[in-house]
Amino acid sequence: MDSDSLHYSLDLAAANGLTLSSEQRAALQSSLLIVKRNYKFSRVLFWGKILGIKSDYFIAQGVEDDELKNRKSLYSLNCVDWHLLPPATESMIADVALAATGRFTGDPSHEYEHTEIRTEGEGDEATHEEVTVKVIEASRLAAIVSNIDKDVSVVPRGAFIKSPNGKVQTNRSFGGLHPTEAAKLRNYLHFREPVNLRNKSILEMSELNPALDFLDPLSEDILKGSWSLQLDRGGTVCVLRSLLWLGFTFFHVPQTPQHGYIYMGDGLMNLDLPFML
């Protein structure tokens, strides 16, 4: 959610139990303005909160010229002092998946360690090597934020446009989805690099608007039933909840450009979802 409309956006998400104290709201409102100025971001988004045992991580993201690429993630333990997270590389995500388990501790320097025996060769020529993988919690935090963004970050169709030079920008003429369209899952898109779009046929691509339909719709997710779509406040607010990452909520006010998402949870994927559907 955009930091410029933080209070209004938090009020829309509060119906789902996702809220912050008055002190935290006030601190975020001031500190995110400083982050925007110091890092020279075009926009700053409040991403959410990951719950830890000792303390919680508040997450923000800075946006540069391209809304989709090169987003910078930052974390804070007190809503005032912000620190950049390292970029989440494929090797980092793999190490985190291997070594880090259980809940976050709340200590960015906490070290996770995993040791395994790897065997190379066969028979008498086989050699055994002990391999230890170590990751700190700050790296785990960066990997989890990246994974959640890839899996469930959502925007309404038309909220962003892709220019001929490939840059993704906010669509200033977007006035919101019609209430009828807002109730359909196909009008919400994954805000990440497209995956399923590349597999479409030429005939299917010819029916799409390249300026608007450059992302994957939620209706094409392989895991059907992983989204809960509801209309709250007498049908004036459309709310999407992820059942894969419990604590993720997207909201959109139909016929207005107001939309956003927030995650407040323990940072653990719901691996039981396939058995729950």
UniProtKB/Swiss-Prot annotation:
The family this protein is said to belong to: Belongs to the flagellar radial spoke RSP9 family.
GO biological process terms held by the UniProt record: axonemal central apparatus assembly; axoneme assembly; cilium assembly; cilium movement; cilium movement involved in cell motility; motile cilium assembly; radial spoke assembly
Organism from which the protein derives: Danio rerio (Zebrafish)
Subunit-level organization: Component of axonemal radial spoke complexes.
Secretion signal span: none
Functional summary from the UniProt entry: Functions as part of axonemal radial spoke complexes that play an important part in the motility of sperm and cilia. Required for motility of olfactory and neural cilia and for the structural integrity of ciliary axonemes in both 9+0 and 9+2 motile cilia. Essential for both the radial spoke head assembly and the central pair microtubule stability in ependymal motile cilia.
Protein name per UniProt: Radial spoke head protein 9 homolog
A GO cellular component annotation in the UniProt record: 9+2 motile cilium
Stored Pfam families: Radial_spoke
Keyword field: Cell projection, Cilium, Cilium biogenesis/degradation, Cytoplasm, Cytoskeleton, Flagellum
Major location (coarse): cytoplasm
Cell location: Cytoplasm, Cytoskeleton, Cilium axoneme; Cytoplasm, Cytoskeleton, Flagellum axoneme; Cell projection, Kinocilium
Disruption phenotype: Dysmotile olfactory pit cilia which have a normal beat frequency but an ineffective circular beat pattern. Effect can be rescued by coinjection of mouse Rsph9 mRNA. Embryos with CRISPR-induced rsph9 null mutations exhibit a greatly diminished olfactory and neural ciliary motility, structural defects in neural and pronephric ciliary axonemes and an impaired initiation of startle response to acoustic stimulation.
Taxonomy, superkingdom: Eukaryota
